[in-house]
Amino acid sequence: MMNQNVQGQGNVIKETTNKVFIVGALVKNGLEVINEGEENEAIRGSLTLRTEDGSEHDVQYYANRYKKSNGSFTNELNPQFDTLLAAKEDFIDMSNEYGEPATVIKIGGGSFRANDYMSKNTGALVSTFRINASFANKLEGKDLELNPQLAKYEVSGIITKIEPEMKNIRI
């Protein structure tokens, strides 16, 4: 993402670069097909990839079956849905029962995203980051040799304002 302004709690951050590149062996395939209302089928979930250094990276995906236009679904199929459906059905993870080697995957369109939510246990705001991506491509043959299994993150931005955190203040 280029030059996106992100605002939150008094801070303004100008995001200038947000790119994630990962090539790794599939540890866990957590993609699932779901029905969202009567109109839409979607695929969501994650692929967990392990790079050569042993680190694991959880990559989140979501795609509707049909494209949207002006907030409504069209009859046009979303190619991202088909790509992820093929990944769900065809990619082999490390826990497969046949002992086959895990599929090596290269993610496409990856980026960091804020993941903020209220904790059900404490009621406190939890702020984390997660990796979202658009595509997952299976690497085979010569592509395996040309793409080392590693994770590369390119994230930069400009913080224009920081305010002190105020917690549990009673007025």
Mark where each language-model region is:
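OB-fold and OB-like single-stranded nucleic-acid-recognition modules
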Residues: M1-I171
